[in-house]
Swiss-Prot record:
InterPro entries to which the protein is assigned, alphabetical: C-type_lectin-like, C-type_lectin-like/link_sf, C-type_lectin/snaclec_domain, C-type_lectin_CS, CTDL_fold
Location relative to the cell: Secreted
Annotated tissue distribution: Expressed by the venom gland.
Assigned keywords, A-Z: Disulfide bond, Hemostasis impairing toxin, Platelet aggregation activating toxin, Secreted, Signal, Toxin
Family label: Belongs to the snaclec family.
One annotated Gene Ontology cellular component of this protein: extracellular region
Signal peptide: 1-23
Ribosomal protein as UniProt keyword: no
Name by which UniProt lists this protein: Snaclec mamushigin subunit beta
Organism annotation: Gloydius blomhoffii
PANTHER family attached to this UniProt entry: MANNOSE, PHOSPHOLIPASE, LECTIN RECEPTOR RELATED
Amino acid sequence: MGRFIFLSFGLLVVFVSLSGTGADCPSDWSSYEGHCYRVFQKEMTWEDAEKFCTQQRKESHLVSFHSSEEVDFVVSMTWPILKYDFVWIGLNNIWNECMVEWTDGTRLSHNAWITESECIAAKTTDNQWLSRPCSRTYNVVCKFQE
């Protein structure tokens, strides 16, 4: 009986010490502020990258940023693996929903845009965002909530 109590107490201590420390993320993912992140050194188009992320884990998508601290965390993950490179992030203008108008205030009625939509990539060195054709291939950072 004493062994059982000791073992039960030991398991309780391990469980309590692991809760809230990223234990809810799979071992190959990194935890930050209730989310799990993973860098994939696989170059693919933006659309394929988003699809790839959704196939990795339920509710996983290309990374989104909601604070400068989160940006710093992701840069600290991507830099050692990818060095000077770009990664796709979860921003795009695929549906071209921006309202564009001329400097004289008239709306755009003739469209001569290249049909390629623009997606957003982030530099791994400082996370500056750049608009890139969605057909370009870059590495991937996926994110999901723990």
